[in-house]
Amino acid sequence: MRSTPVRLSAVLGSGALTMALVAAPVSPAAGAPRATEKDPVAVGSGGAVATVDAEATRVGLEVLRKGGNAVDAAVAAAATLGVTEPYSAGIGGGGFFVYYDAATGEVHTIDGRETAPQAMQEDAFVENGTPIPFNDAVTSGLSVGVPGTPQTWDVALDQWGTISLGEALHGATQVALRGFVVDQTFVDQTAANAARFAEFTSTSELYLPGGQPPAVGTVFRNRDMAATYDLLAEQGVQALYNGPLAQEIVDAVQEPPIAPGVTRLVRPGLMELGDLASYEALLREPTAVTYRGLDVFGMGPPSSGGSTVGEALNILETVPLAEIGETQALHHYLEASALAFADRNRYVGDSDHVAVPLDELLSDGFAAERACEISPLTALTKPVAPGSPDGDYDATCGSATSAALADEEGLSTTHLTTADRFGNVVAYTLTIESTGGSGIVVPDRGFLLNNELTDFNFTDTQGGNDPNLPAPGKRPRSSMSPTIVLEGGEPLLAVGSPGGSTIITTVLQILMNRLDLGMELPDAVAAPRATQRNTASVQAEPGFPRAELAALGHLFANNPEIGAATGIEFLDSGLLQAVAEPQRRGGGSAGVVIPS
């Protein structure tokens, strides 16, 4: 294990350190990493990058400045997030990549979702007739799906990039070697996972040096991750799917490196070498709806993001939100979200394994039938029943309720957005599912494995024909919603967010804020959020207006923080506006190649 945090003061000589103790604070030595200021908004030209992390944004911008395009920058930034935001993303996970090609005017998507091993059966998360406790399922080899992120990068660069994988990984490798300055968010996430990280020798050695999380202000280096990136640069991603890394991943899944004295039953996983060798990141058709004259593109199954955001937008388009006032606009947003989530839960899964009525879910006729259930006077009783996307729409309004579903989809994940001087745009959401994934670091490789398979429903939630039960080679349903909006065939904006199933409502609310309520994109991102996912109560951040909505019958529960979005808008002036969070998750980082 070659990954250690180092206090900034430790790089100084003892004399300098002694002087620092009695005088001014110590500055880092020349060449040592320094905490980078995060700017949540940047306006300019030549290209733009927005991520949650200043290092990742910097690396992406460097690629653009050297002549790379939006795809090159997206891969480089994502690889850097695997170093600086390792509890949310990395090569042990997966994601969804949405790309607008300025040369053709077309939108393409890559499905890099993690996949169930061939040995996984429908009852994989059931023991003695009872579902495995969720937290125990997460922290196990059983939860680990075949990673898709490395192949996503490879496919993206091969299809649309201009640089090699090795070139794309260079900046991230340097960050891993040089280190980054630990902030409070990193410390908090480590501390929240410390108990389960301590259960695995490889994880505790990397992330709990001396048995404790790294301190704020220390420099965290991950030389194992750098060496792993070097291996991928030299041998290509097949080193992970068919080469030396494959066996190491399978060993970690089948025989997790459990620390002595651990009392948790850490279940082994089912992954075999053949599962890695047969994995494919897939090019899929994007979802597409028209909203207020704009074309909105998203990710299709196995993500439910594009279909659910798209259905909700279709429902909202039946109402002139800009003319009815804030309370009614938010009321309709919450109701449309609940209706779309009911349909998501009932119908959406991996379309290679189940029949998903995607065209009907995104049809105007179905939206009109669902919209007629919304009353401006009172909130629907939640949870609402799913509709019938059968092509026979007579605007007959339903009113039935259904059983509530537990939502245990992990709130981790990260989203980045890039654009280049040619007008190409990427919206890319990637994840290892829960914060810290499965908790298992592949020994001496510097990265965590995902727990993506806990995104399957453990048992049937739909009274038959549940679309999201485990199956061999199946991809669990996702909520990731990378979204690109075109106006007249040209990019207007791109946006996405982490946050489990709240991703869908975060993206939907930002779109409504920007396109209907007249907010500029920075304000649309920063505005207080609420999420209604067909549950009895609405989870809302502080500052979200509740009183008048409560008078309509909406019930509220507190949620301190929902999502952590990034986006880019193409302004009328011809400039780019890159936007990240000003506060959530410690704030994000937006940058442009040439500031205005």
Question: How would you describe each model-predicted region?
Answer:
Residues 63-64, 151-159, 235-242, 247, ...:
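Alpha-helical support elements that line or immediately flank enzyme active sites
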Residues 20-37:
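C-terminal region of N-terminal signal peptides and the immediate post-cleavage residues
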Residues 422, 473-475, 507, 516-560:
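Extended C-terminal subregions enriched in glycine
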Residues 269, 321-431, 445:
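Internal maturation/activation junctions in enzymes
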Residues 89-90, 94-101, 414-418, 482-484, ...:
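Short beta-strand scaffold segments in enzyme catalytic cores
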Residues 1-16:
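N-terminal export and membrane-targeting signals
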Residues 83-109, 126, 259-272, 424-493, ...:
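Active-site rim segments in enzyme catalytic domains, especially the processed small/beta chain
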Residues 32-58, 62, 70-235, 240-241, ...:
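Noncatalytic scaffold domains of N-terminal-nucleophile
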